[in-house]
Amino acid sequence: MVSPENANWICDLIDADYGSFTIQGPGFSWPVQQPIGVSSNSSAGVDGSAGNSEASKEPGSKKRGRCESSSATSSKACREKQRRDRLNDKFMELGAILEPGNPPKTDKAAILVDAVRMVTQLRGEAQKLKDSNSSLQDKIKELKTEKNELRDEKQRLKTEKEKLEQQLKAMNAPQPSFFPAPPMMPTAFASAQGQAPGNKMVPIISYPGVAMWQFMPPASVDTSQDHVLRPPVA
């Protein structure tokens, strides 16, 4: 049997020469070996290149950050300048509108004061025109009402005129110059006529008390000279 004092008994059984390969007691460690085909110089070169690349990236990133910040600042300033230019143009245009004949003012506060004054004046004139328009509308309504009343009055007067014309035509119509033939007289009236030969009134039943000679001239009706002009026959 192998005595426990000899700790290298395994090496005696292996027919290979490993050089410095030794077996140590408790607490031994294996030596760190390099990968096959890779030298220590190449690994050092890789580490060095990685460090150089990182070092080269840091200044570039700082430059890009500064460029981006400067470009953002310049674009903001450009936008602000454009906004101010547009605002100045608006003020110049407003000043030219407020005072067409005079050169435009450069004081923005004065331009705003003039604009407020002009707006207040125009608002007052607009209110006056609105009130005048409402009063004119009321007058138009009143005139329309009077027009309708006058139209009704005109129609009424026209109707009365037509009635008066019809009445006037009826009054101016020619009257008949003769009377209809009287009916037969009774015998009592005939005997009365014989007893009163000088009576010129002939009783008519339809028209009692009407003289028959009413349409003859007075000279023809006069009988005072009959005994001279027409003597009775002997």
From Swiss-Prot:
One GO-annotated biological process of the protein: glucosinolate metabolic process
Coiled-coil boundaries: none
Segments forming domain bHLH: 71-122
SUPFAM superfamilies, alphabetized: HLH, helix-loop-helix DNA-binding domain
GO cellular component: nucleus
Pfam annotation, one family: HLH
Ranges of compositional bias, category Polar residues: 36-54
Keyword Transcription regulation in record: yes
Tissue expression as described in the entry: Widely expressed throughout development, mostly in vasculatures.
InterPro entries: bHLH_dom, HLH_DNA-bd_sf, ILR3-like
Sample GO molecular function, one term: protein dimerization activity
Xref: SMART domains: HLH
Region feature (Disordered): 34-85
Gene inactivation effect: Plants are more sensitive to IAA conjugates.
Described purpose of this protein according to its UniProt entry: Transcription factor. Plays a role in resistance to amide-linked indole-3-acetic acid (IAA) conjugates such as IAA-Leu and IAA-Phe. May regulate gene expression in response to metal homeostasis changes.
Complexes and interactors: Homodimer. Interacts with BTS and BHLH47/PYE.
The protein's name in its UniProt record: Transcription factor ILR3
Gene (UniProt): ILR3
